């Protein structure tokens, strides 16, 4: 009996060692399957948003446990862009911190492809395919090894990183939930086919912020054409307030892209800071409006929210998937918080004599129940007798419900003999205003039935009309 028991025990030990050996071989084989992946996947923590202290290693299941990956929460993967220094830029920990503040239980992974991103731009642009493949293989491994749902994955790519995110999304076994493109790079991608860049097919939902599209197509820092389900162009997308456009253009013209790193950061990186703003100021999201062109938007013709014509910028965007990409526009402040309040103003200029003036400067002041915004400048390319003009203005503060406005026609900066002999003027009876954020329409009437607006003279005053049927909420 003792010999039999010894035999059984020996056999059990042998089988256990054989199983362990095979398991070790299988684990080694799995590691070998991913040995060619050069990108690194650092799971940062809320306590240390600036350092890559723990890496998730494809093929090494133990690394996922070691890094305390939360399998029941959503995962953000941050993919940086081209770098001159070969180091992370200052926005990376800021975005990581904002993501954790908004989603404390989430996983925030920073994808490190710095060794490839510091090459000459065309070389790094070509590497986005390899980076995209690395990211896709990592995501597929997480799904296959741990049954992690791709519906919990949100990729955020900046500049070249946006295209790497798109390529990754096109190669995953199932679609990831969302890709956010933060001013996707333009050179080498403006005319590229969809498989080689970010496109709407790369995720269940793709939203894009375009913040530095100034220049001819293919030469602008950020891509100009829409590449998502919703493409938002803050301030027209060409350049951002608070950034020195003249200096950036001069340096690009004189030295090319190589020395422009610091200058392009302002508008290019504004896409990141707008998204960070949406994470930190969730109760006051910036509103963007669908429009056929930035010119139409500047006329105030697009402040409608009917049938998904407006949307939130950033994290709280409504996932609208139209057949065609939706181009949306908004104005912003020059610093965080970036939210402004949009208004369409419509004025009919009347008169007994035919007059036409070009490039005329005006100021409008709005007074509301909460605050006021005075002397907002705007220019009308043309003002003619008996014509109605629509234009967009915005305020940096919430003035509440509109009560009164003042309109001033400014003098020319140069001396005009015709203005010296006689002051041009128009008769204005009503001014119509629509608030984009509240969708409320208000009609203002002259205090004296008709106001006579004269160039260089005192402003005309208009108060909210008493007829309630004139003032209503609109979509």
Swiss-Prot record:
It is linked to Hyperlipoproteinemia 1: An autosomal recessive metabolic disorder characterized by defective breakdown of dietary fats, impaired clearance of chylomicrons from plasma causing the plasma to have a milky appearance, and severe hypertriglyceridemia. On a normal diet, patients often present with abdominal pain, hepatosplenomegaly, lipemia retinalis, eruptive xanthomata, and massive hypertriglyceridemia, sometimes complicated with acute pancreatitis. Detected in blood plasma. Detected in milk (at protein level). Residues 341-464 form the PLAT domain. It is a peripheral membrane protein. GO terms for cellular component: catalytic complex; cell surface; chylomicron; extracellular region; extracellular space; plasma membrane; very-low-density lipoprotein particle. Changing residue 268 to Q: Loss of enzyme activity with triolein and tributyrin. Changing residue 210 to D: In HLPP1; complete loss of enzyme activity. Changing residue 303 to F: In HLPP1; approximately 6% of normal LPL activity and 40% of LPL mass are detected in the patient's postheparin plasma; results in the production of a functionally inactive enzyme. It is an enzyme of class 3 (hydrolase). The active site is at residues 159, 183, 268. Changing residue 98 to T: In HLPP1; decreases the specific activity of the enzyme; reduces the secretion of the mutant protein significantly; the total LPL mass is reduced compared to that of the wild-type construct. Changing residue 279 to R: In HLPP1; decreases the specific activity of the enzyme; the total LPL mass is reduced compared to that of the wild-type construct. Belongs to the AB hydrolase superfamily. Lipase family. Changing residue 185 to T: In HLPP1; 3.2% of activity. Residues 417-421 are annotated as: Important for interaction with lipoprotein particles. NCBIfam families: lipo_lipase. Key enzyme in triglyceride metabolism. Catalyzes the hydrolysis of triglycerides from circulating chylomicrons and very low density lipoproteins (VLDL), and thereby plays an important role in lipid clearance from the blood stream, lipid utilization and storage. Although it has both phospholipase and triglyceride lipase activities it is primarily a triglyceride lipase with low but detectable phospholipase activity. Mediates margination of triglyceride-rich lipoprotein particles in capillaries. The apolipoprotein APOC2 acts as a coactivator of LPL activity. Ca(2+) binding promotes protein stability and formation of the active homodimer. Interaction with GPIHBP1 protects LPL against inactivation by ANGPTL4. Inhibited by NaCl. Residues 1-27 form the signal peptide. Changing residue 434 to N: Impaired heparin-binding. Changing residue 183 to N: In HLPP1; lacks both triolein and tributyrin esterase activities. Disulfide bonds join 54-67, 243-266, 291-310, 302-305, 445-465. The modification 3'-nitrotyrosine is found at residues 121, 191, 343. Ca(2+) binds at residues 194, 197, 199, 202. This is Lipoprotein lipase.
């Amino acid at each position: 009996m003792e010999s039999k028991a010894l035999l059984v025990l020996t056999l059990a030990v042998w089988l256990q060692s054989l199983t362990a050996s095979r398991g070790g071989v299988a684990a080694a084989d799995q590691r070998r399957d991913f040995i060619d992946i050069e990108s690194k996947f650092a799971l940062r923590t809320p306590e240390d948003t600036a350092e890559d202290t723990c890496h998730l290693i494809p093929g090494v299941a133990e690394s996922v446990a070691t890094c305390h990956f939360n399998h029941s929460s959503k995962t953000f993967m941050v993919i940086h862009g081209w770098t001159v220094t070969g180091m992370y830029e200052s926005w990376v920990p800021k975005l990581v911190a904002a993501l954790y503040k908004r989603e404390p239980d989430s996983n925030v992974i920073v994808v490190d492809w710095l060794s490839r991103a510091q090459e000459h731009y065309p070389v790094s642009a070509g590497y986005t395919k390899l980076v995209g493949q690395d990211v896709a293989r990592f995501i597929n491994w997480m799904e296959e090894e741990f049954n992690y749902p791709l519906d919990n994955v949100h990729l955020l790519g900046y500049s070249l990183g946006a295209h790497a995110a798109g390529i990754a999304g096109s190669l995953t076994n199932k679609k990831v939930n969302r890709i956010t493109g933060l001013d996707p790079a333009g050179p080498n991608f403006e005319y590229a086919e969809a498989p080689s860049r970010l496109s709407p097919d790369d995720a269940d939902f793709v939203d894009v912020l375009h913040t530095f599209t100034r220049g001819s197509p293919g030469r602008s820092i950020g891509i100009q054409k829409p590449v998502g389900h919703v493409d938002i162009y803050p301030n027209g997308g060409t350049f951002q307030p608070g950034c020195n456009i003249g200096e950036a253009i001069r340096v690009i013209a004189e030295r090319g892209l190589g020395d422009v790193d610091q200058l392009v950061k302002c508008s290019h990186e504004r896409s990141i800071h707008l998204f960070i703003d949406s994470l930190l100021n969730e109760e006051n999201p910036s509103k963007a409006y669908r429009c056929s062109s930035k010119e139409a938007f500047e006329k105030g013709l697009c402040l409608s929210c009917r049938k998904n014509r407006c949307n939130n910028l950033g994290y709280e965007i409504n996932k609208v998937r139209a057949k065609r990409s939706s181009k949306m526009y908004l104005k912003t402040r020059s610093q965080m918080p970036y939210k402004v309040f949009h208004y369409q103003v419509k004025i009919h200029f009347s008169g007994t004599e035919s007059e036409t003036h070009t490039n005329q400067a005006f100021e409008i002041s709005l007074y509301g129940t909460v605050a006021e915004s005075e002397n907002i400048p705007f220019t009308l390319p043309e003002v003619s007798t008996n014509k109605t003009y629509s234009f967009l203005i915005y305020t940096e503060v919430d003035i509440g419900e509109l009560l009164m406005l003042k309109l001033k026609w400014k003098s020319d900066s140069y001396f005009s003999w015709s203005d010296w002999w006689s002051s041009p003027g128009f008769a204005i009876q009503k001014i119509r205003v629509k608030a984009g954020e509240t969708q409320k329409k208000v009609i203002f009437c002259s205090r004296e039935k008709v106001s006579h607006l004269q160039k260089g003279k005192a402003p005309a005053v208009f108060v909210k009309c008493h007829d309630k049927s004139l003032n209503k909420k609109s979509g």
